[in-house]
Amino acid sequence: MIRLNPNLKNLKKNYLFVDIQKKTDKFISENPDAEIIKMGIGDVTLPLCETVVQAMKKAAEEMGNKETFRGYGPYEGYEFLKEAISEKYKSFGAKIEPNEVYVSDGSKNDVANILDIFAKGSEVLITDPVYPVYLDSNVMAGNSVKYAEATKDNNFLPMPSEKSDIIYLCSPNNPTGAVYTKEQLKKWIDFATENGSLIIFDAAYEAFIEDENLPHSIFEIEGAEKCAVELSSFSKAAGFTGVRCAYMIIPNELEISGEKLGDVWLRRQSIKFNGVSYVTQAAAFASLSEKGKEETAKAVKYYKENAKIIAKVMAELGLYNIGSENSPYIWVKAPNSMTSWEFFDYLLKEANIVCTPGSGFGPSGEGFVRISSFNSRENTLIAAERLKKLKF
């Protein structure tokens, strides 16, 4: 008789953002006149930039022409996009060859899908709090998960301690906004090298880094090419949450069990993935053009300004917060010993603002909430005025 994957029973009943939506919907049904401002889920709100839109139109027209029509594309992505991504890394001082780039339809997928190529029952270390998909995907795979606690005491940047097979690092971190320095990443790289571990480095928010001394990629640090892969995405940097395009960097030097990891990943992709559409990749390529970079940078700046507006108000209220300098998120300590969900309920009831409870990102997130800057300036300013009126 067919059976379900028994590991599914070890998952929480709902994904974090499903619970948030249910609570929000219930509040709206009971308070139909409330003007809710959603600052929870990290979804962009600005439209795609003009250069990207024109590239998509042109690519779509090419698909309707017999001479320029394209069918299935390469599993790992078209060469034109891989070369553009390679050039992007050069601007960071990281040497990445086009054949080390593997284009996909989203980093969320890559986070989970890469587990297909590793042995079941692997020991996995994730920082806590962090993006829930790291935990859930490993629970589904039957892996053993350990936490490296990110707290105020360590500036939300835990350093190596326990040996593990796979290490997930996210910098800038989601949800805290904390960013590792080159020196700190070097310690993680040395730790992984000494223990035969693989680092899965999530750089989804690197476009929001302002500090010129902070690394945008783990491959800016010597030794990473032998112990790390990197995930990155066009979702937040270019507003592609509804378009879906990302990529993984797997260095040619990286081997596991005597096999080149890039070759193993490509074999996996050839079985379970048919590549990203030509129209989507043409759009991603356009976002990396000089004009595209100029336009997408304006959107990133817009969100960063939103973050600073909210962070300033939180500071004026006397609430500890971090993240707004190099991240689109503001990580806020709840007042009066409130739990994460209690502060969520308070903000929803008293200010009609939806945030994300920090406990949903892991045990160490208890007592915090995450506020997203992905919103209109108008809504951000209205939210700021509502927050100013709160009394704790």
Identify the residue ranges that each predicted region occupies:
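Conserved core of the PLP fold type I
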Residues: 67-192, 206-211, 215-221, 225
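Hydrophobic residues in well-ordered beta-strands that form the structural core
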Residues: 126, 147, 201, 355-357
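Conserved core segment of the aminotransferase class I/II
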Residues: 221-301, 308-312
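Helix C-cap/helix->beta junction micro-motif
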Residues: 31, 141, 194-195, 317, ...
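N-terminal small-domain helix-loop-helix segment of the aminotransferase-like
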Residues: 2-106, 113, 287-290
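Conserved glycine-rich beta-strand-loop-beta hairpin in the small C-terminal domain of fold type I
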Residues: 281, 285, 300-314, 321-333, ...
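PLP-dependent enzyme catalytic core of the Aspartate aminotransferase-like
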Residues: 87, 95, 337, 346-355, ...
